[in-house]
Amino acid sequence: MKTGIHPDYVETTVQCGCGNTFTTRSTKKTGNIVVEVCSQCHPFYTGKQKILDSGGRVARFEKRYGKRGANKAANTDSADK
């Protein structure tokens, strides 16, 4: 192994936007990393996760034009009565 080719591995403080700080090790020379979210404020870890069903192309088509099979079945039931 060559000597002197590896970067220094220093103790680094990570600061989150929520105010949480923790210490880890990194090769970043300043010894300070600022992040927007961490495990203390990320919705997945806090349990405040909102599931957004944006749907895909099929859902968008069905919303725009309706489900062909569902409307057909509803129309035949009402016509039989």
Swiss-Prot record:
Its cofactor is Zn(2+). Zn(2+) binds at residues 16, 18, 38, 41. Binds 1 zinc ion per subunit. GO terms for molecular function: metal ion binding; rRNA binding; structural constituent of ribosome. The keyword Protease does not apply. One of its GO terms (cellular component) is ribosome. Keywords: Metal-binding, Ribonucleoprotein, Ribosomal protein, RNA-binding, rRNA-binding, Zinc. One of its GO terms (biological process) is translation. Transmembrane segments: none annotated. Binds the 23S rRNA. Belongs to the bacterial ribosomal protein bL31 family. Type A subfamily. Part of the 50S ribosomal subunit. NCBIfam families: L31, PRK00019.1, PRK00528.1. PANTHER family: 50S RIBOSOMAL PROTEIN L31, CHLOROPLASTIC, LARGE RIBOSOMAL SUBUNIT PROTEIN BL31C. This is Large ribosomal subunit protein bL31. It comes from Mycobacterium sp. (strain KMS).
